[in-house]
Amino acid sequence: MAGFPLLLTLLTHCAGSWAQSVLTQPPSASGTPGQRVTISCSGSSSNIGSNYVYWYQQLPGTAPKLLIYSNNQRPSGVPDRFSGSKSGTSASLAISGLRSEDEADYYCAAWDDSLSG
């Protein structure tokens, strides 16, 4: 079966008229149906290291949907094929039993303490 891309985008935190990218994701990941794919998100002690991580899925032409909150919790209705984890200043989203409908943009998010005040 042919592989298909899971497109990833950097999350940008905005404040006022400026924006700063503080979390880093790889530009893309791919897999074949049925596989397990892991998407990474790297940060620092001021964001992932000291705050909860959230993951969003954005299908083409739709608004972002919350997949994971508080590092590893799934909202009602999100399949258990999706799981989140965090270790130190990095987080990851795992998708098991990959399906064609999983092709989307995936965003990680975390508050950054350095942007406060």
UniProtKB/Swiss-Prot annotation:
Disulfide bonds join C41-C108. GO terms for biological process: adaptive immune response; immune response. Residues 53-69 are annotated as: Framework-2. Residues 70-72 are annotated as: Complementarity-determining-2. InterPro entries: Ig-like_dom (IPR007110), Ig-like_dom_sf (IPR036179), Ig-like_fold (IPR013783), Ig_sub (IPR003599), Ig_V-set (IPR013106), IgV_Light_Chain (IPR050150). Residues 73-108 are annotated as: Framework-3. One of its GO terms (molecular function) is antigen binding. Residues 20-117 form the Ig-like domain. Residues 45-52 are annotated as: Complementarity-determining-1. Residues 109-117 are annotated as: Complementarity-determining-3. Residues 20-44 are annotated as: Framework-1. The modification Pyrrolidone carboxylic acid is found at Q20. Its main location: secreted. The keyword Ligase does not apply. Immunoglobulins are composed of two identical heavy chains and two identical light chains; disulfide-linked. V region of the variable domain of immunoglobulin light chains that participates in the antigen recognition. Immunoglobulins, also known as antibodies, are membrane-bound or secreted glycoproteins produced by B lymphocytes. In the recognition phase of humoral immunity, the membrane-bound immunoglobulins serve as receptors which, upon binding of a specific antigen, trigger the clonal expansion and differentiation of B lymphocytes into immunoglobulins-secreting plasma cells. This is Immunoglobulin lambda variable 1-47. It comes from Homo sapiens.
